[in-house]
Amino acid sequence: MRIGVLTGGGDCPGLNAVIRAVVRKGVATYGHEFVGFRDGWKGPLEGLSRPLDIADVRGILPRGGTILGSSRTNPFKIENGVERIKDNLAAQGVDALIAIGGEDTLGVATQLYELGVHVVGVPKTIDNDLGATDYTFGFDTAVNIAMEAIDRLHTTAESHHRTLVVEVMGRHAGWIALHAGLAGGANVILLPERQFDVDQVAGYVEKRFQHQYAPIVVVAEGAQPLDGQMVLANQELDSFGHVRLGGIGQWLAEQLEAKTGKEARTVVLGHIQRGGTPTAFDRVLATRLGLQAIDAVHEGDWGKMVAMQSTDIVRVPLAEATRELKTVPLERYAEAEVCLFYTSDAADDKAR
């Protein structure tokens, strides 16, 4: 069997580990051939590919990014896009596709499967917001990067007696903000799942200063104040209809400085959260997902996504995985609140 592999959407630590596992087992165990399509769905759309063999994936396990490149190309927004993909797969003798990506990439995979393309999906997103899987690779790396940044920011915030607002990724789900904020000892965590009252946040900040400690506020890029307005970097939409978020951290810092009279600064972690070497957890998870994906292809189990449920790697229908996003349950946020800030004058310990 000749199998195509592609990576779509934002880059993510662990992508190369998936590619490596797929190719190594596919060649050594099953004797399959592989072709890597470049730059997401743009590859099969335009026939852009490269050969993939065991020698091509040697040494890529610890590397961030993806050796195949990526893009946010949506073939369903391009004239004759589906027909072009089918024609290029046939021209290159590709019998099946393994698509590694998030909600958009796997959404395309779901539609192509329904149109007769043999496809298996592998979930990828640092946001950890894909349904039907407990964890996605890249999330653990992003959380560790954000946590280390928060750890470092505590000392500079306290040295200068200022509020530091740390903006992390998370369009619709605040998993990174919640986990990194808790692990880094943040005093306030703001998620897309729950609108926040900026006056209440200012009150928490003032109480922190009353105890002679400088506050750290962690905010997901998709968090919204009570008026429900997202802060956007610009009004442009990508090929999947997403706006570009950015600026909630700066807006919040300005509001807090005005309301508390204390200096507030913003740190936007941005793309650093999804760059560089994956953690051990993400390398192992990505490898296990890749091994299960090539098993599914070999067995002809099309239209499935491999997923982590509890500690097991299972297969679920692609349609189920892309039906809805996995957001942070409010009870998870509620159980964390006791660790975030103090409301008692007797509380004089640091939050971490």
Give the ranges of each region predicted by the language model.
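Short, acidic/small-residue loops that bind anionic groups at enzyme active sites
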Residues: 113-143, 190-194
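Glycine-rich oxoanion-binding loops at beta->alpha junctions
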Residues: 44-99, 104-105, 137-144, 148
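Accessory alpha-helical/coil subdomains and C-terminal extensions
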Residues: 96-101, 109-111, 139-157, 167-262
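Single conserved hydrophobic/aromatic residue that forms the stacking wall/gate
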Residues: 342-352
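Short Gly/Thr/Asp-enriched flexible loops that form oxyanion-binding sites at enzyme active sites
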Residues: 18-22, 103-117, 177
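Short glycine-rich or small-residue beta-strand-to-loop segments that form or flank ligand, phosphate
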Residues: 2-9, 66-71, 96-99, 164-167, ...
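N-terminal phosphate-binding or glycine-rich loops at protein starts, especially the Walker A/P-loop
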Residues: 1-45
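C-terminal non-catalytic interaction/assembly regions of soluble proteins
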Residues: 244-344
